[in-house]
Amino acid sequence: ELDIQLVVLAGFMHILTEEMVAAYPNAILNVHPALIPSFCGAGYYGLHVHEKALDYGVKVTGATVHFVNEEPDGGPIVLQKAVDILPGDTPEVLQRRVMEQAEWHILPQAVSLFCQGRLSVEGRIVTIKEGE
């Protein structure tokens, strides 16, 4: 039997089964290409997220790392990073900027915090403990 302590979803555009989520409470991290609770939930993945952000006219978007629960993109938020939307952005350009400026930074940071035992979850609130 494996001793799995953390599952990381990056570019995994599928909803996990209830059994999988229940087997790893507060031990599955996902990165979402928006500032949750905006542009998230069932159907909000990939380029669609950035299309919706541009269509809505928001000035800032970003990325969120959160623990996975039974609700798509509904788990407790670990880290977020904002990214400006620039005039002339296309969904593809925005997607790339969000990946490079936010996702690629906060996902490894969240994994590191988890592995150091520095994340505490109470309800929807994630607290980051001071490092030693």
Residue ranges and their predicted role:
Residues 128:
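Conserved catalytic region of serine esterases and O-acyltransferases that act on ester linkages
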Residues 1-5:
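Glycine-rich phosphate-binding loop signature in dinucleotide/nucleotide-binding domains
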Residues 6, 10-125:
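Donor/substrate-binding cores of folate-linked one-carbon enzymes
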Residues 131-132:
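Phosphate-binding loop/pocket of nucleotide- and phosphate-handling active sites
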